[in-house]
């Protein structure tokens, strides 16, 4: 069931990539977003964070869309490390995770991630697993478990907020006070709260303050430096997704700093759309995809709808499982690539 996570990650990359490259030239009112109050988990995160992501995993798990999509995606090879984690803790996210909210801070050399998850947890087994390499302590009146990060230094801090809620902070710099990451401006996080309220009714959403996104960050195969000029006047980016029977409705909205820049964004997207159509008409380009992938990409270009409000530009698309499966299909080069053999090293069996 690790396919569920792979599907969600691929979905996010596909939607944002589509926003950068394709545009259906039509203007009109921006479609109504899935308004609502912030989910309880999101309310526990600092609203000053530059990037907040939320997923109602339980509702997605029950949706006909995800059930059909998972059936179309080949199962990945079993991860021995994850299998050991499930055996030791009794926790399998595909079964036990109900919802998760994540705040991400752009820190160097790696981002700081603050996550709160809700689900079914065996506190005794998870605590024992954390103490294999970590140690316990007290912070803000509750027990925390500080675990050294084996990759990139720093540590992870785990704590139980309630029996069914876990907080996990991955701090690559090893500091204990995440509050030092809070910006002095917008102390109450009112701007982020407003943007979240516009998408809070969605099963999955992400809101990013664009001035805090590193320009050298990679998004799939796209480096943001390549589209820095394209996005320089976008202040906020919001992504929301809601299952609709066997499909998934996705809205990507960019809020610009002026009406003129919103209009310019339309023109830029229109240019990318025409360029994408022209490229996909070339046999040399289409052969880089499977027939299913090329057909899905061509269909995606034609189905994306755009609307513009005063300072906002919104892209809306309805994805069927078959369309996403085609977009996620491996390229011919990936299909021909021989499997990578992982060298065994008995001396490093335990990390």
Per-region residue spans from a language model:
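A contiguous, surface-oriented mixed alpha/beta subdomain in the mid-to-C-terminal portion of proteins
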Residues: 207-268
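Structural boundary/hinge residues at secondary-structure and domain interfaces
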Residues: 2-9, 13-153, 196-228, 267-301, ...
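One face of beta-strands
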Residues: 51-53, 113-117, 235-239, 246-254, ...
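Generic beta-strand structural signal
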Residues: 104-108, 138-139, 159-161, 241-243, ...
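Helix N-cap motif at beta-to-alpha junctions
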Residues: 119-122, 171-174, 257-261, 319-322
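A conserved glycine-rich beta-strand in the N-terminal activation segment of trypsin-fold
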Residues: 154-214
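Short, solvent-exposed coil/turn segments at beta-strand boundaries
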Residues: 110, 121, 140, 159-166, ...
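An acidic-aromatic pocket/loop used at catalytic or ligand-binding sites
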Residues: 53, 156-172, 300, 304-308, ...
């Amino acid at each position: 069931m690790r396919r569920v996570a792979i599907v969600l990650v691929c979905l996010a990359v596909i939607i944002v990539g589509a926003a950068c490259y394709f545009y259906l030239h039509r203007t009109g009112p921006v479609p109504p977003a899935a308004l609502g109050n912030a989910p309880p988990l999101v309310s526990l995160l600092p609203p000053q964070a530059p990037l907040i992501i939320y997923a109602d995993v339980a509702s997605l798990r029950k949706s006909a869309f995800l059930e059909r999509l998972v059936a179309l995606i080949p199962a990945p090879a079993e991860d021995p490390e994850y299998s050991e984690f499930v055996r030791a803790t009794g926790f399998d996210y595909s079964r036990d995770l109900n919802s998760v909210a994540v705040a991400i801070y752009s820190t160097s050399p790696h981002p700081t991630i603050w996550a709160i998850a809700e689900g079914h947890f065996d506190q005794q087994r998870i605590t024992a697993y954390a103490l294999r390499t970590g140690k316990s302590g007290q912070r803000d009146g509750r027990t925390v478990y500080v675990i050294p990060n084996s990759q990139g230094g720093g540590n992870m801090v785990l704590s139980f907020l309630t029996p069914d809620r876990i907080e996990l902070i991955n701090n690559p710099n090893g500091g204990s006070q995440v509050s030092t990451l809070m910006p002095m401006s917008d102390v109450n996080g009112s701007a982020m709260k407003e943007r979240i309220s516009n998408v809070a009714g969605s099963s999955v959403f992400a809101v990013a303050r664009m001035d805090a996104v590193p320009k050298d960050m990679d998004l799939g195969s796209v480096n943001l430096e390549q589209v820095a000029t394209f996005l320089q006047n976008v202040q906020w980016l919001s992504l929301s997704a809601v299952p609709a029977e066997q499909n998934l409705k996705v809205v990507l909205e960019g809020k610009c700093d002026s009406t003129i820049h919103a209009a310019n964004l339309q023109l830029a997207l229109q240019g990318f759309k025409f360029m994408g159509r022209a490229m996909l008409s070339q046999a040399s380009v289409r052969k880089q995809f499977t027939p299913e992938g090329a057909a899905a990409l061509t269909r995606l270009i034609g189905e994306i709808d755009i609307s513009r409000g005063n300072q906002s530009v919104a892209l809306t698309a309805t994805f069927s499982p078959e369309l996403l499966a085609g977009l996620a299909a491996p390229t011919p080069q990936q299909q021909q690539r021989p499997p990578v053999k992982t060298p065994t090293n008995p001396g490093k069996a335990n990390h």
